């Protein structure tokens, strides 16, 4: 069985017929609508299966209809749920491509072998993605560094098996 991947969160209700507003974590946001079999994770950790009946872009977000949810009151009970799918449902990537979740947690070393921390998360800036690297007990210091995710320019190597990334980065920055 593959691991679960969070692809979005239900953030509100939309209309009176049970539709829900969703914050998508996929890129582009409407890609989340490709997956019909969801697992909803409530804030208390309880899980339940859900089937996507319909969905569409609406304004700057996404709205969805779940099978069996046809009124606003029932829809309200789903607000706050994380939406997960099996990682095996995600499209296969080309060589050298990675999902953000694969990069998060990697230990980051400079070309000179200096440990500068771990990838905490990534930020989408429009121009390019940015790694947020946070220092740890094993790293040179506890600073937070923002490193542009530009393979071939700043990113020299990624080894998922060894859980590490090598960057061309001055540790003083």
From Swiss-Prot:
<comment type="function">
    <text>An accessory protein needed during the final step in the assembly of 30S ribosomal subunit, possibly for assembly of the head region. Essential for efficient processing of 16S rRNA. May be needed both before and after RbfA during the maturation of 16S rRNA. It has affinity for free ribosomal 30S subunits but not for 70S ribosomes.</text>
</comment>
<dbReference type="GO" id="GO:0005840">
    <property type="term" value="C:ribosome"/>
</dbReference>
<dbReference type="InterPro" id="IPR002676">
    <property type="entry name" value="RimM_N"/>
</dbReference>
<dbReference type="Pfam" id="PF05239">
    <property type="entry name" value="PRC"/>
</dbReference>
<keyword id="KW-0143">Chaperone</keyword>
<dbReference type="InterPro" id="IPR011033">
    <property type="entry name" value="PRC_barrel-like_sf"/>
</dbReference>
<comment type="similarity">
    <text>Belongs to the RimM family.</text>
</comment>
<dbReference type="InterPro" id="IPR009000">
    <property type="entry name" value="Transl_B-barrel_sf"/>
</dbReference>
<keyword id="KW-0698">rRNA processing</keyword>
<feature type="domain" description="PRC barrel">
    <location>
        <begin position="95"/>
        <end position="173"/>
    </location>
</feature>
<keyword id="KW-0690">Ribosome biogenesis</keyword>
<dbReference type="GO" id="GO:0005737">
    <property type="term" value="C:cytoplasm"/>
</dbReference>
<keyword id="KW-0963">Cytoplasm</keyword>
<comment type="subunit">
    <text>Binds ribosomal protein uS19.</text>
</comment>
<dbReference type="InterPro" id="IPR011961">
    <property type="entry name" value="RimM"/>
</dbReference>
<dbReference type="InterPro" id="IPR036976">
    <property type="entry name" value="RimM_N_sf"/>
</dbReference>
<protein>
    <recommendedName>
        <fullName>Ribosome maturation factor RimM</fullName>
    </recommendedName>
</protein>
<dbReference type="GO" id="GO:0006364">
    <property type="term" value="P:rRNA processing"/>
</dbReference>
<dbReference type="GO" id="GO:0043022">
    <property type="term" value="F:ribosome binding"/>
</dbReference>
<dbReference type="Pfam" id="PF01782">
    <property type="entry name" value="RimM"/>
</dbReference>
<dbReference type="GO" id="GO:0042274">
    <property type="term" value="P:ribosomal small subunit biogenesis"/>
</dbReference>
<dbReference type="InterPro" id="IPR027275">
    <property type="entry name" value="PRC-brl_dom"/>
</dbReference>
């Amino acid at each position: 069985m593959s691991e679960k991947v969070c692809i979005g969160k239900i953030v509100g209700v939309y209309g009176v017929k049970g539709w829900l507003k969703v914050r998508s974590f996929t890129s582009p946001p409407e890609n989340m609508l490709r997956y019909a079999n969801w697992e909803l994770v409530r804030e208390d950790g309880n899980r339940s299966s859900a089937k996507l009946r319909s969905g569409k872009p609406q304004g700057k977000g996404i709205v969805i209809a779940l099978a069996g949810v046809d009124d606003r009151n029932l829809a309200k009970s789903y607000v706050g749920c994380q939406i997960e799918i099996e990682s095996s449902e995600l499209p296969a990537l080309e060589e050298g491509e990675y999902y953000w979740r694969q990069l998060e947690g990697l230990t980051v070393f400079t070309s000179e072998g200096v440990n500068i921390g771990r990838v905490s998360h990534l930020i989408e800036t429009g121009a390019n993605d940015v790694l947020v690297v946070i220092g740890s007990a094993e790293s040179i210091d506890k600073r937070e560094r923002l490193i542009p995710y530009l393979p071939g320019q700043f990113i020299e190597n990624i080894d998922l098996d060894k859980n590490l990334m090598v960057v061309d980065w001055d540790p003083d920055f």
